[in-house]
Amino acid sequence: MIISGKELSAKLKAEMAARVATFPEKYGRVPHLVVILVGEDPASVSYVTGKAKASEVVGIKNTTIRKPADITETELLDLIRELNSDDTVDGILVQLPLPEHISEAKVIETIAKEKDVDGFHPLNVAALWQKQECVLPCTPKGIIRMLKAAGVEIKGKRAVVIGRSNIVGLPVSKLLLDENATVTVAHSRTADLAELTRQAEILVVAIGRPKFVTADMVSDGAVVIDVGVNRDPETGKLCGDVDFAAIEPKASVITPVPGGVGPMTICCLMENTIECFMKNRK
């Protein structure tokens, strides 16, 4: 079974659009997301465009602020502080990666916790690990939504997450733990990785290496979630971190690239923007 993130996200966005349509009468306005793009990295431009299109579908106001790659760190932090104090702005997202002269950690810390739609602020991260209410990071949240939509029973399953980034690997391992899976986090220094992945009933791969996971690394009937977005060195086409063509016949459930986790990440960003809007109304 292939889980289409495109189809699931379209359904969820339609539901959100119906809800947001009632907001002007209820609250006087719709949620407002501000996206800051520094420089002209083609991948970043593409991601920002995707977020603007999704906002339009859902009915969220989207403002994209473009800044040159040579903007100073101080100028960028001052801009974020301005947006923090603007009551008409509900969500702030700074598209990563940033130029080397700007500290991503400082940028993330400067965004107000209440407007951190990415769920990257240290206080939101701490709340996640302490099982407190918080804004969940978009990709891990989208992965759990996809598993549930596909009817995958997470409780009691052996889950292996390859990748330990703060953006995907670590938070998705925590969300799987919260769903009562038994979770192992693997990484570049893991010994006997294939032996470990073959034990996985749920395998999440987020390492950014094209077709790294091969068919012999996956057990029959496994659920495979592919977070990677890469260029296939042979064809130049988009591909994931797993060899989809070889693994799809073995897997009980698998996500494609493109059209899998990516659309759900943007969908959950829309959800988080609405969530921040609602919390800030109280």
PLM region spans:
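Anion-binding alpha/beta catalytic cores of soluble intermediary-metabolism enzymes, centered on
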Residues: 93-154
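Flexible, glycine/charged-enriched surface loops at secondary-structure junctions
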Residues: 25-32, 214
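Positively charged, low-complexity intrinsically disordered leader regions
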Residues: 1-27
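Glycine-rich phosphate/diphosphate-binding loop of Rossmann-like nucleotide-binding domains
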Residues: 38-52, 134-223, 227, 232-248
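Short, well-structured alpha-helical segments in soluble
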Residues: 75-87
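Rossmann-fold NAD(P)-binding glycine/threonine-rich loop
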Residues: 104-121, 125, 228-281
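Short beta-strand segments enriched in small/hydrophobic residues
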Residues: 31-39
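Short beta-strand elements in bilobed, periplasmic/extracellular small-molecule ligand-binding domains
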Residues: 55-69, 183-185
